[in-house]
Amino acid sequence: MNRSRRLALLCLGVPLLLQACASVAPSRSFDVDQDAASRQYTGRFSANYVRYGRDEGVQGSFRWEEQGRNVRLDLVSPLGQTLAVVTATPSGATLDLPNQPPRNAPEVDTLMEEALGFALPVAGMRDWLHGRATQGSPARATRDEQGRLATLAQNGWTVRYVAWQDTPAPGAAATQVPRRIDLARDAGSNPLSVRLVIDPQTP
């Protein structure tokens, strides 16, 4: 499929995603954790995958908000349409789509794949966005000359840290955080690759 057609099919062939730019309010609230630290990331994503035996692709922007083990992920097309809102908490996960009832499950990855044709590894991204492996799960990692993660194989995914960036910290030296992350899942007949480019952080 050529690039222009991929852009025309940004909404993955799901008719509900081709409707007008409607905002999607999350139907699941964060579990209460008043002492948990909060962090937000914004950036761009692109995904290439196989659906019904055909190569497909989607791209857009994302907003990631986390508070402790609570996560909200918004996916938005280049035209400003909300593709999906994912909310994952210790008590469960919800996928909200435009003009559709909420979909609930213990984990959101399967819901995303069924509805959108691809799934971002939300559980792993809680740690991978911070440049670290998920604790309690087997992993193989390599590091660059500066001691930063270069590659990580964990939970069926290969994670490549392509670029890093400084993030300012008031009253302290800047720390290095990922700038670009490439993820690949080899699932036999349903491979999936995802590229994340993370916006610079502000103090």
Curated annotation (Swiss-Prot):
It comes from Cupriavidus taiwanensis (strain DSM 17343 / BCRC 17206 / CCUG 44338 / CIP 107171 / LMG 19424 / R1). Monomer. Belongs to the LolB family. It is a lipid-anchor. InterPro entries: LolA/LolB/LppX, OM_lipoprot_LolB. Pfam families: LolB. Keywords: Cell outer membrane, Chaperone, Lipoprotein, Membrane, Palmitate, Protein transport, Signal, Transport. GO terms for biological process: lipoprotein localization to outer membrane; protein transport. This is Outer-membrane lipoprotein LolB. GO terms for cellular component: cell outer membrane. A lipid is attached at residue 21 (N-palmitoyl cysteine). Residues 1-20 form the signal peptide. Plays a critical role in the incorporation of lipoproteins in the outer membrane after they are released by the LolA protein. It is found in: Cell outer membrane.
